[in-house]
């Protein structure tokens, strides 16, 4: 088992070297249908492995709790770096400023997804266990494999209708003592609906499209326009399905714990 732990770390190191040598993964490298094919091939390969050779050392290692901890630890470390280092789509050492597009981050997530699938294939079915692990696998798959299919478009929204389906009806900004904007919000009419959007509080235009407020006309006291960015996420439903499954799994886990405690108290 320890040798395979070492192999996992060696492959991770190789992915880091690959990142340093080649740079970020091309934006469309994992785009549909390649991402869906990779996920399906991974699931099928693991299903065959655990049906035909479940006693192999690699198969036992991949489905073990020890391996889950190892992979979650490396993912947690990557997420800490992600939170501490400002992310920009620019060249940086080992991709530290654009982690989601690095070879080594994709390597970590693919291994973790494989581990979750392996655990599901080798454990006795329990609904709460299935919901938690399958939900996490779906959420990770949607976030990682679905990111190449994401697209965004920024545009200026004026008070007059320009044929985009969006017009600005009012704008409000708050300023700090040094004169810099501390927050702002725009009242927009989108597809016939009056909505208010703020920074980091997008409007869900469709199931797959979110409209973000990113900037505004700073050349005059009363802005003539604001700038919004529409982000299209085709895999958003997969991510939300995974999140909902994990929430249901957590509720069942809590309910099971309460039921178990009551049974113990009844025996005393």
Where would I find each of the regions flagged by the language model?
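Solvent-exposed, non-transmembrane regions of integral membrane proteins
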Residues: 1-268
């Amino acid at each position: 088992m320890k040798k395979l732990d070492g192999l996992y770390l060696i492959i991770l190191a190789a992915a880091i070297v690959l990142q340093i040598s080649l740079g970020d993964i091309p934006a469309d490298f994992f785009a549909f249908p390649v991402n869906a094919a990779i996920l399906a091939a991974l699931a099928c390969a693991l299903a065959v492995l655990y049906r035909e050779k479940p006693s192999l050392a690699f198969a036992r290692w991949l489905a073990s709790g020890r391996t889950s901890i190892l992979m979650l630890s490396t993912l947690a470390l990557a997420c800490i770096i992600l939170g501490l280092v400002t992310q920009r789509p620019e060249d940086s050492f080992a991709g530290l400023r654009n982690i989601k597009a690095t070879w080594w981050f994709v390597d970590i997530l693919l291994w973790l997804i494989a581990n979750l699938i392996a655990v599901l294939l080798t454990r006795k079915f329990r609904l709460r266990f299935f919901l938690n692990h399958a939900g996490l696998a779906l959420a990770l798959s949607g976030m990682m494999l679905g990111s190449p299919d994401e697209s965004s478009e920024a545009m200026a929204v004026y008070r007059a209708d320009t044929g985009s389906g969006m017009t600005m009806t009012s704008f409000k900004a708050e300023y700090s003592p040094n004169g810099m904007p501390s927050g702002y919000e725009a009242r927009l009419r989108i597809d016939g609906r009056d909505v208010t959007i703020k920074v980091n509080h997008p409007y869900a235009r469709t199931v797959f499209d979110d409209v973000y407020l990113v900037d505004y006309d700073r050349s005059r006291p009363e802005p003539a326009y604001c700038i919004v960015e529409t982000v299209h996420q085709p895999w958003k439903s997969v991510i939300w399905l995974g999140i909902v499954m994990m929430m249901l799994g957590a509720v069942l886990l809590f309910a099971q714990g309460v039921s178990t405690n009551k049974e113990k108290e009844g025996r005393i």
